[in-house]
């Protein structure tokens, strides 16, 4: 019997390859999520600050708006206006594309 061993070629360990691929992927994903959360919080703060700044300038009252809309409708009913549809305005203006004189 022979006491010799056959040298094996070095093979890449599959666990180390997974680490090389998944490590950067998870790192980039984590950085992206952190950036998205920071941007969301900044936007929310900016919108809240703008809302608190504009709120004292404007007070919304739906009843007041409804009353104003009714007044506009009533005032418009007193003024007779002629409103043409889009088809009636174009039908009488049809002209030939080429004006040929014979």
UniProtKB/Swiss-Prot annotation:
It is a single-pass membrane protein. It is found in: Membrane. One of its GO terms (cellular component) is membrane. Glycans are attached at residue 3. The keyword Signal does not apply. The chain crosses the membrane at residues 21-41. Keywords: Glycoprotein, Membrane, Transmembrane, Transmembrane helix. Expressed in spleen, thymus, prostate, testis, uterus, small intestine, colon and peripheral blood leukocytes. This is Small integral membrane protein 29. It comes from Homo sapiens (Human).
């Amino acid at each position: 019997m022979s006491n010799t061993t056959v040298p094996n070629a070095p093979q890449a360990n599959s666990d180390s390859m997974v680490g090389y691929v998944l490590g950067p992927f998870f790192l980039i994903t984590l950085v992206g999520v952190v950036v998205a959360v920071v941007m969301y919080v900044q936007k929310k703060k900016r919108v809240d600050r703008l809302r608190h700044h504009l709120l004292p300038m404007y007070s919304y009252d739906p009843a007041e708006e409804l009353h104003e809309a009714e007044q506009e409708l009533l005032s418009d009913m007193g003024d007779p206006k002629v409103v043409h549809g889009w088809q009636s305005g174009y039908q009488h203006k049809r002209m030939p594309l080429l004006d040929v004189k014979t």
